[in-house]
Amino acid sequence: WAWGLESDEPAAEQREQAALRIGRRFGVEVVAPPSPTIGQVRLRAPRLQPPAALAAFCTTETHDRAAHSYGKSYRDVVRAFRCEIPNPPDCVAYPRAEAEVTAILQWCSEANVVAVPYGGGSSVVGGVEPPGGDRPVVSIDLRELDRVLEIDETSRAARIQAGVLGPALEDQLRPHGFTLRHFPQSFEWSTLGGWIVTRSGGHYATNHTHIDDFVESVRMVTPKGVWESR
C-alpha cells in the first residue's frame, strides 16, 4: 500500500504509538487503522481477457490489478489503504522479451485497448494510474526486462533494459568498475525506463542532475513498430 517492502511495515504497536504522539501534539484523537488485506479489495470484473497466445505472461488476478492501479503519491497511498480502487487495470502483462512487448501492443492496438507502461510504480503524478473511460486497460509491467545487456568499456556506455530497478542496475555495473551515478530519492523503487520518460532528477542526483544527461540513445517498442532515437 506504500513505499518499501511488506516485511518492513511498522508493527501495529508502532503505528499506535505514532498515532498517540500525533494526537497529543495536535490535540486531536488519531486512530491507527489496521492495514487492509487483499481479501478486502473488491474490484470490478475485468472487461477483457488476454488471448491464449499471451496468457502465459498476462493475468487478471485481483492482487496484480490492485497493485497496478496507483502510484505512490500520498493521495494514491490513502486511496489504496482504504481499498478505494474504482478504476483498476483490466489485465496486467509481464513481458519477458521485446517480442512479447510487441505482441501485447499489437493486441492492444487491434482491440482498442489502452496500454499503460509500468516500471517501479513510484510515480507521484498519476503516471501509472489507468485513465477513465470505457476502454479496457492493460498495465504492462516491465520488471522482467531488468538486465544490462552489453557494456562497452572503451566508450563507457551500456545497453540496459527499461525495467531494471536502481539497486539491481548498480549491482550489474559494479563488477565492471562502472556506475550510472544517478540516485533519485525513488532510487530503490523506480526503474531506468521510468527515469528516462520522466526526466528523473532529485536531491541525490548531483552535478548532472537529470537522467537525460546520461542517455545516448533510446530503443522503444510502439504500436507501429520499433523506434530508435539514433
State the predicted function of each range.
Residues 1-230:
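Noncatalytic alpha-helical scaffold of FAD-dependent oxidoreductases
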